[in-house]
């Protein structure tokens, strides 16, 4: 759709083509900014919708630019480049949205450690961490249920936004609500526990944990892959993504 709009704009006039490029660049810039600040994104976009758009939301802006470029292309190599870019955009859209077409995972018997839920696969850290945190605030659930609510999929797992969506849906109609916040490491000691966050594992991978105490030189976590874990503050700071899900009384 946005590709066709860009193509139409460029065919209509060079000025409209340039405007389409500017709009596409602005779209990309805003979307990238929202990916870095999901706490702002959930205030602008309903979280249920955002959870489904986060992997594909940049594509309309990109395709608008590509459509305008194709419409303005005068040389054969420019048209070839525009076609290749169109294919790249389509592939990115398919990759980002593929999880919605995948079946939910079939999980084995749950494993608990002192009432906390250990992940049963290498991709269900979000499901296990959210189930653990919810249990700590008095809402019983399972890894299997939270895998469904958080859109967990084999291999790809889930995301912080989908975790927030799943927890929000689980808490619907209850006295407790979830809040997604941006917080510095030094601020975590002032927030109520348990809280959920993701830690960076390399450039692309993320691993969700439950923060139990962030007030000292070590941060006490429940890591659903191994259980209780005490992480040096400097190491935690280096891996922390800057966003947490906390629990608060509804209306408070």
Where are these regions (language model features)?
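An acidic helix/loop motif centered on a single conserved Asp/Glu
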Residues: 128-129
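Second-shell loop/turn segments in exported
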Residues: 112-122, 132, 147-157
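Conserved active-site-adjacent core of cysteine acyl-enzyme catalytic domains
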Residues: 1-82, 89-104, 135-136, 140-252
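Active-site-proximal loop/helix segment associated with metal-binding centers of metalloenzymes
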Residues: 125
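N-terminal signal-anchor transmembrane helix
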Residues: 103-111
């Amino acid at each position: 759709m946005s590709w066709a709009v860009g193509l139409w704009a460029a065919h209509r006039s060079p000025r409209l083509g340039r405007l389409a490029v500017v709009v596409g660049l602005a779209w990309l810039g805003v979307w990238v900014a929202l990916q870095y600040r999901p706490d702002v994104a959930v205030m602008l976009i309903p979280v249920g919708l955002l959870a489904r758009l986060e992997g594909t939301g940049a594509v309309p802006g990109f395709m608008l630019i590509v459509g305008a470029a194709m419409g303005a292309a005068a040389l054969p190599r420019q048209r070839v480049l525009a076609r290749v870019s169109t294919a790249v955009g389509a592939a990115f859209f398919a990759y980002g949205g593929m999880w919605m077409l995948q079946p939910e995972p079939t999980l084995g018997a749950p494993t608990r450690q002192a009432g906390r839920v250990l992940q049963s696969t290498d991709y269900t850290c979000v499901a296990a961490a959210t189930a653990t945190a919810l249990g700590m605030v008095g809402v019983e659930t399972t890894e299997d249920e939270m895998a469904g609510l958080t859109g967990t999929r084999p291999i790809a797992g889930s995301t912080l936004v989908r975790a927030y969506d799943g927890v929000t849906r689980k808490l619907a109609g209850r006295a407790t609500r979830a809040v997604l916040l941006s917080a510095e490491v030094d601020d975590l000691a002032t927030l109520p526990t348990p809280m959920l966050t993701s830690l960076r594992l390399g450039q692309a991978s993320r691993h969700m944990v439950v923060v139990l105490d962030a007030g000292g030189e070590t941060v006490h976590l429940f890591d659903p892959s191994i259980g209780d874990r005490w992480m040096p503050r400097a190491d935690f700071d280096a891996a922390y993504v800057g966003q947490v899900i906390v629990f608060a009384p509804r209306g408070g």
